[in-house]
Amino acid sequence: MNVFWFLPTHGDGHYLGTTKGARPVTLNYLKQVAQAADDLGYYGVLIPTGRSCEDSWVIASALVPLTERLKYLVAIRPGIISPTVSARMAATLDRLSGGRLLINVVTGGDPDENRGDGSFLDHSERYEVTDEFLKIWRRVLQGEAVDFEGKHLRVQNAKALYPPIQKPYPPLYFGGSSDAAHDLAADQVDVYLTWGEPPAAVAQKLADVRERAARKGRTVKFGIRLHVIVRETSEEAWKAASTLIEHISDETIAAAQKSFSRFDSEGQRRMAALHDGRRDNLEIAPNLWAGVGLVRGGAGTALVGNPQEVAARIKEYADLGIDSFIFSGYPHLEEAYRFAELVFPLLPEPYASLAGRGITNLTGPFGEMIANDLPPQAK
């Protein structure tokens, strides 16, 4: 099992949909989140992409030398950048990070943003471009001089003279809910990602991708993207969930849902259908809450509960075949600690160990000394 955290390069705070309790997302703050994730033993961090975020490649490049073990899941955007240039960027960052780069393949689900970035392709064309892009990208990073002529992309003698550390190339992660997305995942990527739908729906998606991959003689790993609200008691967790959205007005929800309706993303449509823009019935499965999706695009669901409940839901998804879990919580610095402290001990190794991923406690016992003389009691 690999557990990721999230870098909030699009903003952070105590509440959604308001400036109340918000905090500036500076390089120093992102460094704190990344270093906390590194020290706590998270496998990696996802860096979001798009016009609402700081650039993911610049952020990753700034944070790589400030962390030791943490991997960075960074987006590439077929149709927006050349596959050859993207491959060379990936090779460089993989080398400079000591092999800590992971690649998130993003086709882009907002036509308005895509047009602003110079891409006027429809949904099916974007997947055609992504397929051609990855065929070039993968071969370039394996050391080939690539000649390729497809429907959308053409290169001659495309090459990267400096290879990546990871072989054959940094692992490819990819998410999408349409048939075209499932075909692409089955054919080209290493890890298929889904947003946090109820377990039965996730099981259907995984089975479909697994079957398509088997027909091509391939196997694909699976991951899930979820928020998490965990507290020592279930009552506290559900109160925290309500508090997170207490400052969102109905007008803000309506405006957000109107914006999402222009997307041609099947995954975004499925997220919106979980709540229909209403806040009166947000627990859509045991301990699975759709409140985040009222105003946030992309991943819109959270696991909510006490540590045992959250761990049980994680195991439920793991039993479906999920082995990468990408979590986040508001605010991201505090919640990175809270999740690690409350839930890691209930997860499989290496997370079940207080030492995390081999991190040793060099300063003495955990907790503050008692009366300047006694170590804190172990529990």
Swiss-Prot record:
Enzyme Commission designation: 1.14.14.5
InterPro entries according to UniProt: Alkanesulphonate_mOase_FMN-dep, Luciferase-like_dom, Luciferase-like_sf, SsuD_RutA_monooxygenase
PANTHER family, per the entry: ALKANESULFONATE MONOOXYGENASE, ALKANESULFONATE MONOOXYGENASE-RELATED
Catalytic activities: an alkanesulfonate + FMNH2 + O2 = an aldehyde + FMN + sulfite + H2O + 2 H(+)
Listed CDD domains: Alkanesulfonate_monoxygenase (cd01094)
Protein's job: Catalyzes the desulfonation of aliphatic sulfonates.
Species of origin: Pseudomonas savastanoi pv. phaseolicola (strain 1448A / Race 6) (Pseudomonas syringae pv. phaseolicola (strain 1448A / Race 6))
Protein name: Alkanesulfonate monooxygenase
